Every structure is written in C-alpha cells, then in structure tokens.
C-alpha cells in the first residue's frame, strides 16, 4: 500500500503538492470513488486510478534507452552542468530516476535510465559478467600486440586491475576498434588503450549485454525499453 500522492509523483503525473489540489477538487477517482485526501493509501497494482477522466497506466518501474550525447554528465543532478536526467522528456520523468552506470562526459551512446535499483545493480555488478560493447577511435593503428595486451588483462602501476577485454572487430584502417568489457571502472576503456599504446580520441557505447543501441535514436533522444529488450541485457548468450 502506498500514499496516493507518492504514486502520482512516481508516475510523473504531478508533484505531491499538486496531488493534494487535485484530490481537493475531486479530480481523482479510485475504484469508482472520489478520493479527497492525497495521503490515502491504496494498492496501485490492484486499483483503478482515474485523473481528470484519464485512467492511469501504472508502471512499477521505468526503463529508458537514451542515445547520450557528448558534453552531458551521467548523473541524476548537478548544479553546474547538464545531466542525462535533464534530457529525459517530461512524459517519462518521475521521482528517483538515475543513470544505470556512467559514461564519461565526452563518451556517447547507449545509456539506460531507470528507477529500479535492483535491476541496475544486477546489470552493473562485475560478478554477473554483463559485457558492454564500445567503439573506440584511436590516434594510432591497432596492433596484434595491443590486442594481446587487452585480452590478457591489465594491471596499472597504481595497482588497478582490469579483467581481460574482448576485441570484437578492427576497422580496415586499424584505428577503429570494437571492444567489450564486463566492468565499468573510471575511464576504463581509455586507460586500457593508453596502457597498450594508443589514445582514444572518440568513444561510443553500442551495447549492454545483448541490448544494442537503437540507431534510429538521434543523440539526446530516448524511448522506453520493452520487456523483451530489458531481458536482452541479461541474456547469457550475449555475455
């Protein structure tokens, strides 16, 4: 059971303060009866909630695919810079949204935004081996020695350990490489390539597990994930 105002806020319908006004005006009907108090507790999954004549399609959690642009922070909020949450359309906004994992400010591509902490933890935990696929553009040709270094795992001078990566493809010009990692440490892909002898000049995330970025999404755009797409993240055949 949850408070009605919390339910409406979580679904992006209105703020809790606005919910109080809606209730006072008789605009909210629950199971056929007007609810006058916004702190009334109901079961949102078993109740019919109608706001101004429109039935609420309740979703316990929301999962959003975004094509993150460069220059935007992977954070819920920031006083000085634009964040991925700022880019979420009003129709998807609700309390508790956060990016499931981080991309560097200048990294683009697949970002998953949700309010489901358990699913995000499952996706990000290294023990679950959910691989993330990136396309890296380099300032030097990619060599067999670099491939061997990356696929063997790396230990930096400061003691940071990176698990072995998987090289999926290399462009004919040898300067664009698709690489998979199952971790998400700070600047990991850039640091791994730098250790192997090349600097990353551009980085884009293409996939998480078996879920690939919808290429029809322009940078800054987003859409909801289907249940099937959500399951692809954890498809063992892709991890």
What residue spans do the PLM features occupy?
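Basic, flexible Lys/Arg- and Gly-enriched helix-loop patches that mediate nucleic-acid binding at interfaces
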Residues: 1-239
């Amino acid at each position: 059971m949850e408070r009605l105002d919390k339910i409406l806020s979580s679904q992006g319908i209105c703020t809790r303060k606005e919910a109080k006004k809606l209730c006072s005006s008789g605009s909210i009907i629950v199971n056929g009866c007007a609810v006058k108090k916004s702190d009334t507790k109901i079961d949102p999954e078993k109740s019919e909630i109608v706001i101004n004549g429109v039935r609420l399609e309740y979703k316990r959690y929301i999962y959003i695919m975004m094509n993150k642009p460069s220059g935007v922070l992977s954070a819920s909020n920031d006083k000085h810079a634009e964040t991925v949450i700022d880019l979420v359309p009003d129709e998807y906004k609700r309390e508790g949204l956060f990016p499931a994992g981080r991309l560097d400010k200048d990294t683009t591509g697949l970002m998953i935004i949700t309010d489901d902490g358990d699913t995000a933890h499952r996706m990000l935990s290294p023990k679950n081996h959910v691989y993330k696929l990136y396309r890296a553009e380099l300032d030097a040709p990619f060599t067999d020695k670099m491939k061997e270094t990356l696929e063997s795992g790396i230990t930096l001078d400061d003691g940071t350990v990176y698990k072995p990566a998987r090289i999926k493809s290399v462009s004919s010009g040898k300067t664009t490489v698709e690489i998979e990692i199952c971790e998400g440490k700070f600047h990991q892909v850039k640091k791994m390539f730098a250790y192997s002898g090349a600097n990353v000049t551009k980085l884009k995330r293409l996939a998480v597990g078996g879920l690939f970025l919808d290429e029809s999404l322009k940078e800054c755009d987003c859409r909801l994930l289907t249940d099937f797409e959500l399951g692809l993240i954890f498809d063992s055949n892709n991890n």
